[in-house]
Design a protein with these regions (language model features):
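An N-terminal amphipathic alpha-helical segment
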Residues: 1-29
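Short glycine-rich, basic-tinged beta-strand/loop micro-motifs
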Residues: 27-39
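Short, structured protein-protein interaction patches enriched in aromatics and acidic/basic residues
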Residues: 38-58
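Active-site-proximal alpha-helical scaffolds that flank and shape metal-associated catalytic sites
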Residues: 216-288, 321
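C-terminal helix-coil-helix/basic helical segment that borders enzyme active sites and/or dimer interfaces
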Residues: 299-309
Length: 395
């Protein structure tokens, strides 16, 4: 359908500004459209005819316009050159090859550079409630320096302090994993799917804040971070080494961080019982963030499975492949479990009762993992098998 646009030049003489506006009027028009220039000058016809010939456009006519006591002149031209911009297609499941770094909704000029975004299929990366998750991430921001009253952290006995520092070391390692993995995939997702890079950027910001906070807590009473065990290193390496976004999102956000929020809640209660309310608050704030990350992962996996149920087999393969790798290495981090048992018991003398609490936590983790997997669209029997096959190192 032919459209008409009008550019009011008024007293602008022919020159750089005049022809810039004229160029833009033609640039944004489609082939066959009419462009009308309104000017107070009546001697532009020859210049515009010459410009149209040079540009491959068509000058049609000139006529006068009278408005009260003023006289203006209209110069009518038609665009003969090809349309320069593609029309935005909101229903496309594939990002346009020329999308570049333009946001969703943009019309892209033809012949723009081709960026290679490997993750360019909506059916494989999308999830519901992305905007809501992103909005919540902005509302729930907190400051690790000012929102935690570090001076109010109590002094615990040396055994509890070591257990705390060791646990914070472990938490920090896990958060580095949760920082780097989304960062790797962020640059692979086309801006055509604008909400996803925004959500991932919020996740990355959250993880950076958690890393800062856990290190500060380890340093709060002078011990600092402690030991990084081979078991933890290998478990996180098997997570970090996954190069497929769908598998990685499942292993990290659903299986890993889903288990992690149960761990954070357990630790939060431990510190509440010890009277360390600021550390409990820190863990609560981190858990609140992690809950959003799990929601994103579950929405992503659920959406993808609903589009293609056969992808459940891919997730099954990823879980058992990781399980087989870890079984050939070490099992659990005994140093972490002992630290958790001491913390849960409240002292080294009550480590036995604390260890029972840790065992109950592991049962709860397995039950909650199974529930999350079923919510993603996986049948109960397989969900239970996958949950039981998850790394005993929590993440």
């Amino acid at each position: 359908m032919q459209e008409k646009s009008c550019v009011f030049m008024g007293a602008i003489p022919t020159g750089a500004l005049f022809f810039m506006r004229l160029e833009n009027a033609f640039l944004l028009s489609n082939k066959g459209d009419i462009i009308e220039i309104i000017s107070q000058y009546d001697n532009l016809e020859n210049d515009l005819i010459a410009w149209c010939r040079f540009k491959g456009e068509n000058f049609q006519k000139k006529f006068s316009l009278k408005n009260n006591n003023s006289t203006y002149f209209a110069y009518v031209m038609q665009k003969q050159s090809p349309t320069k911009f593609t029309k935005f297609n909101p229903d496309s499941t594939l990002s346009p090859i020329h999308q570049g770094l333009a946001p969703n909704g943009s019309s892209i000029e033809l012949a723009s550079p081709k960026y290679h975004f490997p993750l360019n299929n909506k059916n494989e990366i999308w999830g519901n409630n992305l905007e809501q998750i992103y909005e919540e991430s902005k509302k729930m921001q907190w400051n690790a320096t000012t929102d935690i009253l570090w001076s109010e952290i109590p002094s615990l006995d040396s055994t509890l302090e070591f257990a705390t520092a060791q646990i914070m070391t472990y938490l920090t390692e896990n958060e580095f994993s949760a920082l780097y993995i989304p960062s790797r995939f962020l640059a692979q997702i086309s801006p055509f799917f604008t909400p996803i890079p925004l959500v991932l950027s919020s996740i990355i910001g959250d993880e950076g804040r958690h890393i800062e906070s856990f290190i500060k807590r380890a340093n709060a009473t002078g011990l600092g971070v402690q030991y990084s065990t081979l078991t933890t290193q290998q478990s996180l390496y098997s997570l970090w080494n996954e190069k497929d976004y769908f598998k990685s999102s499942f292993l990290l956000h659903v299986m890993g961080e889903g288990t992690f929020i149960d761990l954070l809640r357990f630790l939060e209660k431990c510190f509440e019982n010890l009277g360390d309310l600021q550390t409990a608050k820190l863990l609560n704030l981190a858990r609140r963030d992690e809950t959003r990350h799990v929601a994103y992962g579950m929405n992503h996996i659920k959406s993808t499975i609903s589009q293609n149920p056969s992808k459940i087999a891919i997730l099954k393969d990823a879980v058992f492949k990781r399980k087989n790798y870890l079984e050939s290495q070490n099992d659990e981090s005994s140093l972490l479990l002992e630290s958790m048992a001491i913390l849960a018991g409240g002292s080294e003398t009550k480590i036995s009762s604390g260890f029972e609490s840790v065992l109950e936590l592991k049962k709860k983790m397995e039950k909650n993992r199974t529930k999350r997997l079923m919510e993603c669209g996986i049948d109960e029997d397989l969900a239970r098998d996958l949950s039981r096959s998850h790394t005993p190192n929590f993440m």
